[in-house]
Design a protein with these regions (language model features):
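Sequence/structural signature of beta-propeller modules
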Residues: 1-77, 83-84, 400
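Repeated scaffold domains used in trafficking and secretory/extracellular systems
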Residues: 30, 76-90, 119-131, 161-170, ...
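Structural motif
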Residues: 54, 103-105, 141-145, 182-188, ...
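A short beta-strand motif characteristic of beta-propeller blades
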Residues: 66-81, 110-118, 150-157, 195-201, ...
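Hydrophobic beta-strand positions that form the internal "hydrophobic ladder"
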Residues: 96, 133-134, 173-175, 216-220, ...
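Non-cytosolic head/periplasmic domains of membrane-anchored proteins
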Residues: 114-222
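Solenoidal tandem-repeat scaffolds enriched in leucines and small polar residues
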Residues: 183-275
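Intrinsically disordered, low-complexity segments enriched in Gly and acidic/Ser/Thr residues
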Residues: 281-372
Length: 400
């Protein structure tokens, strides 16, 4: 009897010893399958990135917006706002800033109101930097700094006279160009924390625009003057801390529209050409418009500028052009459709036609299309390949 019990015990131990490896092997097999699946997914992502970075953005959007409910066209209503013809829009990250003659509001990516303020702005304008944006009144003395969380500081007290222009670079250095008693105009530079780092007073010429360059060590200012009996804009670059220009360049016979940056170069957009300078003032390149009328521009692409040109003062004979940081034309696209708005960001260019939205690559190959957009008035491109459509009182996010 005891021998029988011992035999049963021995068999039971043998079964347990044989079963344990099988359980371990099953767990190992499942683990290997999980690892294999992850490797496959990683391989797909790497292959997409190797083939086309926009495909990688598609994968990112798949995960970022997988819980967002889209309509059959792939768009989502973001928020609603007052129907005001004075509305000015800008994106700070994924937050929408709306400034009008009656106030400022910031909406999150989910459409909730992050901050709202009632304030009188005669000519509202927005300048966007890296993490902050300046909302100001052209010709007035109101200046607010916002982050995605809301109002950061009220800098209205810094304005000794009426504001002429404001710019914010990618490191959130701000250049305030304003009138000043005893001078034609004055430019003051503030760092990201709002501390004053440089002041420049112009006693002979009016400063049209000023920007802090990407290295945050230099400032570029454009003054309006005269050369050989014709109007001429002078582009001067100063080291912060010195009121003596390191370099001076003259743009003769053209009207400066804005200063900006393309791939770290200083971009001077005029009514006739796009001229680019390096940080030391050396000419990097220039692109003269093939069509005489500039209808739109965007300098927010990755290492390129997007320009919308027109053959005639009015009409729909258009040419969309991308220009590299050395002034070379990258691609061009002719169009006979009416263009309402154009915006570039990262590797994408959004063009809003009268009845459709088309997203292009920098080579002006069509990337995505949304038809039936008669409700939209303007568009703002985002770096992840999504675009914000702006209507009279609502905004939508288009997710390709």
């Amino acid at each position: 009897m005891n021998d029988l019990k011992e035999e049963k015990g021995t068999r039971e131990e043998l079964r347990r010893s044989q079963a344990a490896p099988r359980r371990s092997g099953g767990g190992l097999k499942r683990a290997l399958m999980v690892i294999l699946a992850l490797v496959v997914v990683l391989a797909v992502v790497v292959a997409a990135a190797w083939k086309d970075l926009s495909s990688l953005d598609s994968v990112r959007r798949l995960f970022s917006y997988n819980k967002v409910t889209q309509d059959e066209q792939g768009k989502v209503e973001l928020c609603s706002f007052s129907n005001d013809r004075s509305n000015t829009f800008a994106l700070l990250g994924d937050h929408l800033i709306v400034a009008s003659t009656t106030g400022v509001s910031i909406y999150s990516s989910s459409g909730s109101v992050v901050d709202s303020m009632s304030v009188k702005l005669t000519n509202p304008a927005i300048a966007v930097g890296g993490q902050t944006a300046a909302v100001y009144d052209i010709g007035g003395q109101t200046l607010f700094i916002y982050s995605a969380s809301g109002l950061v500081r009220d800098m209205s007290g810094e304005c000794s006279g009426n504001i002429l222009s404001v710019s914010v670079n990618s490191s959130d250095y701000l250049a305030l160009n304003a009138e000043k008693s005893g001078y034609k105009s004055a430019v003051t530079v503030y760092d990201a924390s709002g501390e004053k780092t440089f002041a420049f007073n112009s006693s002979e010429h009016y400063v049209i625009d000023a920007v802090v360059m990407r290295d945050c060590k230099r400032m570029a200012a454009v003054t309006l003057g005269e050369s050989d009996g014709t109007f001429a804009d002078t582009v001067s670059i100063y080291s912060l801390g010195s009121d003596k220009a390191d370099s001076v360049n003259t743009l003769t016979g053209s009207l400066l529209l804005s200063l900006d940056s393309v791939a770290g170069t200083l971009s001077c957009l005029t009514d006739e050409s796009l001229t680019l300078f390096s940080s030391d003032g050396t000419l990097s390149g220039s692109y003269r418009y093939e069509y005489p009328y500039l209808r739109g521009s965007s300098m927010d692409g990755d290492n390129y500028a997007a320009l919308l040109l027109s053959r005639y003062r009015s009409g729909s004979t258009m040419k969309l052009v991308t220009v590299s940081s050395d002034g070379t034309e990258m691609a061009s696209l002719d169009s006979s459709q009416e263009v309402l708005s154009m915006s570039a960001a990262g590797k994408y260019i959004a063009v809003l036609y009268s009845d459709s939205l088309v997203l292009y690559t920098p080579q002006l190959q069509e990337y995505a299309r949304l038809d039936g957009t008669e409700y939209a008035r303007s568009v703002i491109m985002r770096e992840d390949g999504t675009a914000v459509l702006i209507g009279s009182s609502s905004a939508w996010l288009y997710i390709p």
